[in-house]
Every structure is written in C-alpha cells, then in structure tokens.
Amino acid sequence: LEWKEGFSATRMAELNSDYTKKGSFGGDTYWGGKGLTQMAHYLTFALQMGDTATFRMAKQRLKEVLIDWYTYTPGEERYYFARYPRWGALIGMDPSYDSETFNDHHFHYGYFVYASAILCMLDEDFRDKYGPLAREVARDYANWQRSADEPWFRTLDPYCGHSFAGGLGNQGNGNGQESSSEAIQAWGGIWMLGAALQDQEMLEAGIFGYTLETRATAEYWFDRQRRNIDFTKYKHPYCCNLTMQGVGWWTWFSGDPVWMHSIQWLPISPILTNFFSEDLKLTCWEYT
C-alpha cells in the first residue's frame, strides 16, 4: 500500500514545526498521555529529518510536561500521580474514563511510559532524574516484581494471554478489553524504557507482555486463522470488544463503526508496524 502522492519532506517539516508549536496536552491521564506520545513522535521525526531547531523545541516541551507530571507542587490540582497504598496503585490527576477505579491503566499510563522511553534515550539528564519515576508508572500496570506495593502484572492475565481493561472486573459481562493496539503499545513502552534505563528485568517483562498481547490479538481479536469466531453468525470482520462472555462489535463510548475499526489501530506507532504488517488490507478496510 502506498500513499498516492508520495512522501513530501517539505510538508512533513511543516507538520513537525506546526505541531511542536501548537500541540496541546490534555489535563487528564488519557488525553494528556496521548499528547505526550504525539510530541515524542514529532521530535523523532524532526531528528530524523535533521531539523535541529524543531527537535530541540519538541524535546524541551515534552521534557517540561513530563517533569510536571512526575513532580508535585503543594496546591496543584492536576498533572501529578498520587499513590494509593491500600490498593497498591498510582492514580494520575486528573483521572478519566474511571481510571480512579483502576480502569484502563495500561492504556493511559502506557502513553507516559512510551513517551518517557523516547525522551530517556535522547536526554541523559531526564533519564537520570526521572527515569525511575517513569519506571514506577510502568509498574502500576505491569509490576514484573513480586513485591507487596503493587499487584503482579495488574492488567495482564497470563493464562488468557492478554490484558483486561476493567480495574475491578465487576461489569455485568465480566472483564474485557477494547483497544488491542493501546495494550500492545503499553508493553512496547515498557520494552523501550527497559532498554533506555538498561534495566534488563524490565526489558524482558516488556518483551514477555508484548509477545503475549500480540499473539492474543491475532488469535482472539482478529482471528487470523478463522478458527475461533463463527463468522456465519458474527457479521463483522473481527472482534472489537473481547469480554469474558465472548466477542462484540461495540465500544463503551460509541456505536459508530468507524470507532470499532480505529480502536484496534490507533495510535499509529512503530510499535505496531511489525504486528499489523500482516493486516494492511484490513487496516484500510471500508465498512459497508
């Protein structure tokens, strides 16, 4: 598949510069995290294109916002993480989509870990001072150490081979997960952060989770071998929402088919390139 107009270095440079200057960061952990990862992507684009000025500007903006999240100033109402010791969890302020009840932590915090990993690779000062805090955010959803302060692999069910998004698992249809792509990104971020911090145990945990999550996504969400879903009854190309009661073509926030499709592909990321290379035709699938 090729973009019919081809790659334009001039247009890409304009996009890099524009986003670096105007890109915003939401005030909650989901939209704030997405803004962080987008800025991390743009700074790598600028670096690869040799645009030193844009790269430095993007890196500085990303660094400032991540430091704000990883520190607390008495009296501030948002942009910080609070530890809930009774639950062994971190809650980012402001929470969203019920993240205060531990929903979707790997989705939300995976953005922070991914963006932090990129910045740690490019900024030694940030790596040394704030890398350990990024590690704590990663441990919230994927604690690879059997310790008392965090559950072991909070969001991952090793037996099922994939993550669950429900923090308490008390929905009427049991626990489940919509966005396979955000789950994969969360593991990729741990893998990258482990490499950046030279933390072998963390790196291996990221590889472990990434391997399980991608294989489960291929098996249960996309059913590549067509051996799990009865497509004579299920009239959709793949599963959008996998719960303990089966497959579903719905999301928690919309019934529009465009969201059922895109929630398995976004955010566009190098982390997904290898996995989704087998699904390029499906990526461009048009709902009819």
Predicted features along the sequence, with ranges:
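Interhelical loop regions of multi-pass alpha-helical membrane proteins
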Residues: 160-165
